[in-house]
Amino acid sequence: MLDRFLPEFDRALRAVAGITRASRPNPADAIVAPTDDGAKLSDTERRHAAGLMRVNHVGEVCAQALYQGQALFARDPAIRAQLDEAAREEEDHLAWCAQRLQELHDRPSLLNPLWYAGAFAIGALAGRLGDKISLGFVAETERQVEHHLDGHLDRLPEHDARSRAIVAQMRDDEVRHGDNARAAGGIDLPEPVRQAMRLASRIMTTAAYRI
């Protein structure tokens, strides 16, 4: 267990501190250069876009924590490898959101350590309950994240092409993660659990938009 805990602890520190590096190119770089669309945003639009991207950044901090907690207690090595691979892609999302926040002259959430700790505890609990439940938790989480990102694509300023490109790629990745979890044997979670997850998500997104 210790040989897995130490690398995960290092990853946790990097996620909370925002010291992450993407393994894939930022999808926004294929759309428009960083300085090109900033002038098109009013100050109100910039603050709104930054609030949404801060929420997305928090979501990726939580995703890192959830996957790390689940992988730590996964019983099947193949499931652990699947969770680790998804976490690496989520780390790309984390780096892209952090870069976009810098471009929008804003900052990540001040509550990131709290978000991470809570999400890790939930992920560890899901992992301890068994791989099928853990995968079901992944599938339901990604389904809710997909819905959340669709909403952000509707709410982002129309001409904020860079944020839109990042969110669109994140959405595609989340859909795939959810499909993979279901294909690997994830079970449907009870409705009260799904409702509790939605409530927790609303609390997080409301706070992260501002703080």
Swiss-Prot record:
- Cellular localisation: Cell membrane
Coiled coil residues, start to end? none
Q: According to the UniProt entry, what is the EC number of this protein?
A: 1.14.99.60
The record's GO CC annotations read:
plasma membrane
Residue sites binding Fe cation 1 per the record: E60, E90, H93, E174
Keywords per UniProt:
Cell membrane, Iron, Membrane, Metal-binding, Monooxygenase, Oxidoreductase, Ubiquinone biosynthesis
UniProt pathway annotation: Cofactor biosynthesis; ubiquinone biosynthesis
Main EC class the enzyme belongs to: oxidoreductase
> One Pfam family, short name please?
COQ7
Molecular-function GO terms, alphabetical: 3-demethoxyubiquinol 3-hydroxylase activity; metal ion binding
The entry's Fe cation 2-binding residues are: E90, E142, E174, H177
Q: Some GO term, biological process aspect, for this entry: which one?
A: ubiquinone biosynthetic process
Q: How is the cofactor bound?
A: Binds 2 iron ions per subunit.
Q: Which CDD domains match?
A: DMQH (cd01042)
Is Iron tagged as a keyword? yes
Q: How does it sit in the membrane?
A: Peripheral membrane protein
The Swiss-Prot or TrEMBL record lists the needed cofactor(s) as: Fe cation
Name the catalysed reactions: a 5-methoxy-2-methyl-3-(all-trans-polyprenyl)benzene-1,4-diol + AH2 + O2 = a 3-demethylubiquinol + A + H2O
This chain's function reads: Catalyzes the hydroxylation of 2-nonaprenyl-3-methyl-6-methoxy-1,4-benzoquinol during ubiquinone biosynthesis.
Instruction: Provide the family line.
Output: Belongs to the COQ7 family.
Q: What is this protein called?
A: 3-demethoxyubiquinol 3-hydroxylase
Please tell me the species this chain comes from.
Answer: Ralstonia nicotianae (strain ATCC BAA-1114 / GMI1000)
